[in-house]
Amino acid sequence: MILRSYARNISTLAKKSNILKDVTANAGSMTIPTLDSYLNALEKLFVIEDVEAWCPAIRSATTIRSGKKREFTDPSIAVAAMGLTPEYLEQDLKTFGFIFECLCIRDLKVYSSALGGKVSYYHDRSDLGADCVLHLSDGRYALIEFKLGSCEIEEGAQHLLQIKQLVQAANASGKTNLREPDLLMVITGGELAYTRPDGVKIIPIGCLRD
């Protein structure tokens, strides 16, 4: 039940208290310490691997969300835990989108590991966010959004541009001296790779390995 509840919250900022509530609704009583012990075991077994928040000084500390994003080491585990089929995911695109995000994060971790890649996410209370912030060991970093369908690309690109503008504004005000993102990228489930006039790269997930 714990694995299934975690899977239902994949790629979200669900609090442990909410996961516990979901578990106890179907499997009797359980405490947070008990839940923690199970989650720690799942981490050690490389079943789950949460993503930490990126908290740059471009907003007040209380504005930026700092909770962990719930992720699996491999999205197929979450799919199996929920008993989902390809046919179901074709009908439930919202759930498919969360699974797709986990898949993208897994691939980015694998392909960037040789460059010391580390992933995090950015999300503030105004609902502005980047699904992934990929930092390399040499200081370069990318702001990334994951969009399963082409209709959502524009929204994702605008989010990335707004975060870049926040970095620029914070630097201009003297509040910080943060490096500007080296890459803005929307990873999609489509087939076309291109660069928009505003500089945002649109990359199909199948192109990442290249």
What are these regions (language model features)?
Residues 1-140:
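Accessory nucleic acid-recognition modules appended to NTPase machines
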Residues 71, 120, 142-144, 185-187, ...:
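Hydrophobic/aromatic beta-strand patches that form the interior of the parallel beta-sheet core
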Residues 77, 126, 150, 191-193:
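Conserved nucleotide-binding/hydrolysis micro-motifs of P-loop NTPases
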Residues 80, 153-155, 193-197:
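Switch/connector loops and helix/strand junctions flanking conserved nucleotide-binding motifs
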Residues 87-92, 156-163:
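Short, surface-exposed loop/helix-turn segments at secondary-structure junctions
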Residues 141-151, 159:
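Active-site ExK catalytic segment of metal-dependent nucleases
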Residues 165-183:
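Short mixed-charge
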Residues 185-210:
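Domain-level recognition of nuclease-like catalytic cores that cleave nucleotide substrates
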